[in-house]
Amino acid sequence: MTDRKRGFFGWTWFVMWRFLLLLALLLLVLRFVPPPTTSFMLQSDYPVSQHWVSIDELPAHMPLAVVAAEDQLFPEHFGVDINSITKALNQYDDGEGLRGASTITQQTAKNLLLWPGRNFVRKGLEAMLAVSLEAIWGKKRILEVYLNVAEFGKGIYGVEAASQHYFNKSARYLSNNEAARLAVLLPSPRNRNPNNLTPYLRQRVAWGEKQMRQLGSGYLKPILTN
């Protein structure tokens, strides 16, 4: 190996480990401090509305609603769902395009640090960051940040801003049905309104409420009381 190549790889390694160290320090800080913004907020085409609320102040059915709708294996996996990823890759091989298959942890990583769109580079970074979040933050913090940074409408981020916008009250006072109606927005928040649901979305809300009952009020208790 020539001196030039050794110099290039040495410089690349130096930059990489410095970047990873800075990333780890950032995640460590955000374990305790609410993120002042996110990459998705910075890229928003709309005025941003977001109000932080502690997960301890939310009714237990609000986090349960998003877990029931988005990631029922959230308490069990370590950031990524291998079965869902395998299924998505098989569908991609069949010509169906690259689908989501993202856990709540992956969605949190994406919303916080990455960019919209679906490609293998972003999905790879998303998975790597998800595992890092699980190791550094833990489940409760991941769920808390997700509930505060997920998009629920055009420029509306987090359940507190969403609750005030759609229901004119704090997320602290959301009912089971209202929580399920907010959760159903998550796959396509800019095209859905919890006060003007299509027949399909009303079915999804009913399904979500049924899943919440089946999972039970204690499903997330080991996480929320940690």
Swiss-Prot record:
Pathway: Cell wall biogenesis; peptidoglycan biosynthesis. It is a single-pass membrane protein. Keywords: Cell inner membrane, Cell membrane, Cell shape, Cell wall biogenesis/degradation, Glycosyltransferase, Membrane, Peptidoglycan synthesis, Transferase, Transmembrane, Transmembrane helix. Its EC number is 2.4.99.28. Its main location: membrane. It catalyses: [GlcNAc-(1->4)-Mur2Ac(oyl-L-Ala-gamma-D-Glu-L-Lys-D-Ala-D-Ala)](n)-di-trans,octa-cis-undecaprenyl diphosphate + beta-D-GlcNAc-(1->4)-Mur2Ac(oyl-L-Ala-gamma-D-Glu-L-Lys-D-Ala-D-Ala)-di-trans,octa-cis-undecaprenyl diphosphate = [GlcNAc-(1->4)-Mur2Ac(oyl-L-Ala-gamma-D-Glu-L-Lys-D-Ala-D-Ala)](n+1)-di-trans,octa-cis-undecaprenyl diphosphate + di-trans,octa-cis-undecaprenyl diphosphate + H(+). One of its GO terms (molecular function) is pentosyltransferase activity. GO terms for cellular component: peptidoglycan-based cell wall; plasma membrane. Disulfide bonds: none annotated. GO terms for biological process: cell wall organization; peptidoglycan biosynthetic process; regulation of cell shape. The chain crosses the membrane at residues 8-28. It is found in: Cell inner membrane. PANTHER family: BIOSYNTHETIC PEPTIDOGLYCAN TRANSGLYCOSYLASE (PTHR30400:SF0), MONOFUNCTIONAL BIOSYNTHETIC PEPTIDOGLYCAN TRANSGLYCOSYLASE (PTHR30400). Belongs to the glycosyltransferase 51 family. HAMAP family: PGT_MtgA (MF_00766). NCBIfam families: mono_pep_trsgly. Peptidoglycan polymerase that catalyzes glycan chain elongation from lipid-linked precursors. This is Biosynthetic peptidoglycan transglycosylase. It comes from Shewanella frigidimarina (strain NCIMB 400).
